[in-house]
Amino acid sequence: MKGNFLPITREEMKGRGWDQVDFVYVSGDAYVDHPSFGHAIITRLLESRGYRVGIIAQPDWRKPESVQVFGEPRLGFLVSAGNMDSMVNHYSVSKKRRKTDAYTPGGEMGKRPDYACVVYGNLIRQTYKKTPIILGGIEASLRRMAHYDYWSDKLKRSVLLDSGADVISYGMGEHSIIELAEALDAGIPVEDITYIAGTVVKAKSLDSIYDAEILPSFEDLKADKMNYARSFYTQYLNTDAFNGKRLVEPYSEHLYVVQNPPATPLTQMEMDDVYSLPYQRTYHPSYEAKGGVPAIKEIKFSLISNRGCFGGCSFCALTFHQGRIVQVRSHESLIEEAKEITKDKDFKGYIHDVGGPTANFRHPSCKKQMEHGVCKTRQCLFPSPCKNLDADHRDYVSLLRKLRDIPKVKKVFIRSGIRFDYLLADKKQEFLRELCEYHVSGQLKVAPEHVAGPVLSLMGKPEHKVYEEFTRQFYKMNEKIGKEQYLVPYLMSSHPGSTLKEAVELAEYCRDLGYMPEQVQDFYPTPSTLSTCMYYTGVDPRTMQKVYVPKSPHEKAMQRALIQYRNPELYDLVIEALHKAGRSDLIGFGPKCLVRPRQVRGSGNDKKAGRKEPKKGSKGSNGQKRQNNSEHRGRVEGKNKKKSIRNVHSKKNRK
């Protein structure tokens, strides 16, 4: 077999001279031995410590024998739904089944179950009644305590209870999984391993649980959503390894779920060690017949520079999963990996990304964090940058220069998100210049998300004027270096706090830019985010103030349609939304109008009214090619033409 992949069959296990593995890793993803995949990191890390690990990727959950490939492991089963929550992987925000799965050979959908951690855990428990089962990965991490589940529209128990598992290793997991392995290897019964940071365990009593904060019981959470809001905020304040408390969630008089404080962040040396493990950097060769695993295309020639994020966006789960303290790899580690990438036969000279959750975070936000942790009730960037913020891109600029100098490297792109408020806080502008000159290919995607103040505040995003200043500096810099490059803003509709009034405000912004996004992301209530808590409870858990929440599919469709008001297929929704918002003044023929009146449709005045009908024989404005693209400037053209996008930001921003 090509390469040194870990065994996926009993025959491969026997071929290594093993009679038994120490751990069996069951994954909802296909086996891809690349450090962008959690199963690759954890299994390689265990291998480096001398443990024997076998992998069962995407077992048939309808057949108990599918998890019996290696027999009973000596120490336990490790279970993960994969790189994504299985429900996000399977369903769009409208709860429609997705057609493809990028983490499955050939992109085939349906190779993992819904709520994969629960299903896999119970499947294993059917056969192996006493074998330890440890859950990990993002699905288990974000469902580790009672949580709102958008897809069933219910409050669910901790996944630890419903899966039949013994322990959850939450967060990134390197520290906790090694401690768990060592404890099991020492013969400690799994029910007695209750003390490891970064784990969640079950307890029958609180006699041996010390220094814990007791959360509302599950019954209390179900009885009153305000209890859930308060409980969630307590959890939110305890996501830091330096000052996080042990939390206890009661389920009955004899059943408690105990969350130990988070594991400590990795040091730079530990980060380097993790990413220097002998990954094959591709999918298992057994998938070749199906065309491989699509997800590899996005990450095969990318470098993971950091983890953790102090951005604090309310709709992002990173605070609960990776934490707010940024951890980074050394230049030497990244350069070594880049050199390995250049040896790949498919490498064309382009490194696709050097980043992580946020590309331009290359050190903790302030000097005190690695000793005292993050501030519990204050954010580093919101509502404005903290006075102690260390906004400095010199290390990142130096790294990017070294990567550009590697032989065979033609260009280094940055595709991870750029936090523009942090960029502006660095007054040197050195990074902005290098970003525009070397690391953008015509377009830079950024995420202002919205323009309305109340919505941005609930999102944890900077005021809109900050984004306006960034656009001004971006275009000024491009003019200075003689380049024509554009910003493409990501926008979100239907976030908590967004009424039709705020949605109209966002539509007017798009009108003033002369820009209609081809895709708009509806807010997606995924487990364990502040925004999801707002969606479920109707309050901001930080203040307990009421928040308007657009929930009906029809209102969400109206909010989305307003942003894409030029799409003829959405005309009726736009008209209805404008009437309901009391903004009928935007229906007409004036330069500020979004659409023309219904009674004169077909009059030939579309352009004047700010509404463009498709010409005869052309297709709607849903991202497909039109016969006359000149009428639709600002859109990415068809695949048979060179991709381009005009400057969607008005010239006033370039002053």
Predicted features by range, described:
Residues 62, 191-240, 254, 263, ...:
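Terminal amphipathic helices with adjacent charged low-complexity linkers/tails
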Residues 38, 57-252, 259:
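Glycine-rich beta-alpha loop elements in corrinoid/cobalamin-binding modules
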Residues 166, 274, 309, 334, ...:
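Conserved, mostly hydrophobic/aromatic
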Residues 159-171, 272, 561-605:
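Amphipathic alpha-helical packing elements
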Residues 85-94, 142-144, 174-179, 204-207, ...:
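Flexible glycine/acidic-rich beta-alpha junction loops that bind and position SAM and/or redox cofactors
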